[in-house]
Amino acid sequence: MRSGVIAQKLGMTRVYNDAGEHVPVTVLRLENCQVIAQRTIEKNGYTAVQLGVGFAKVKNTSRALRGHFAKVSVEPKAKIAEFRVSPDNLLDIGTEITAQHFVPGQRVDVTGTSIGKGFAGVMKRHNFGGHRASHGNSITHRAHGSTGQCQDPGKVFKGKKMAGHMGQVRVTTQNIEVVSTDVERGLILVRGAVSGSKGAWILVRDAVKRPLPDNVPRPAGIRQLAKEKTEMVTPVTETSEAEGAE
């Protein structure tokens, strides 16, 4: 089980696939997503990584969090979240996860907070049909009607669909397809809509109900791996040039 990521919702747009079909996508951005803490079986009883993303001003960060970030030598983060991982996918503190953590065609589960709608009636909140517009109806056109029974059971059952607060709840949408990624700009494009307003923080994980593709990076798509590959190639090139000069 790999770690998820924290992304910021930028909005929606559309792209075209190889067949020329228009695909609506939501654009998610990874900005400075780093591991800031570990949870191990020996110390905590489970394995997980704590991620921080974005940037926050020091003056707007609590003293406790300032000490937490200073302990691991990272800048204050705007958002923190914890992801359960298997022991073999545990990441080192300070590791930065990039958009290459996911691959096109992969299915992911996306979690966000839906847009709040305030106090809503049953027609908007539960898609009720409403009452008749005329023929004896008086000021009950959008009412929900009867809410209970007679003396037995003499109560309104829990879960009864009625008017009330709508939205502003945690919503997880499963099995969303990753259309494409842009590692340089830190963008992940997923098919369809994602709960949350523009600028909202979104949690993206590997889908639990779909198999993981074979070509996903393990333990994660991290920026340090790319640097190590570059450093390994550079000395070989310099050596070969020196031998040629001799």
From Swiss-Prot:
PANTHER family: 50S RIBOSOMAL PROTEIN L3, LARGE RIBOSOMAL SUBUNIT PROTEIN UL3C
Native organism: Bartonella quintana (strain Toulouse)
Keyword field: Methylation, Ribonucleoprotein, Ribosomal protein, RNA-binding, rRNA-binding
Assembly information from the UniProt record: Part of the 50S ribosomal subunit. Forms a cluster with proteins L14 and L19.
Function: One of the primary rRNA binding proteins, it binds directly near the 3'-end of the 23S rRNA, where it nucleates assembly of the 50S subunit.
Disulfide bonds: none
Transferase found in the keyword field: no
Database matches in InterPro entries: Ribosomal_uL3, Ribosomal_uL3_bac/org-type, Ribosomal_uL3_CS, Transl_B-barrel_sf
Protein name, entry field: Large ribosomal subunit protein uL3
Pfam families reported for this sequence: Ribosomal_L3
Family named by the database record: Belongs to the universal ribosomal protein uL3 family.
Post-translational modification: Methylated by PrmB.
Protein's GO biological process: translation
GO molecular function: rRNA binding; structural constituent of ribosome
NCBIfam families noted in UniProt: L3_bact (TIGR03625)
Positions of post-translational N5-methylglutamine modification: Q151
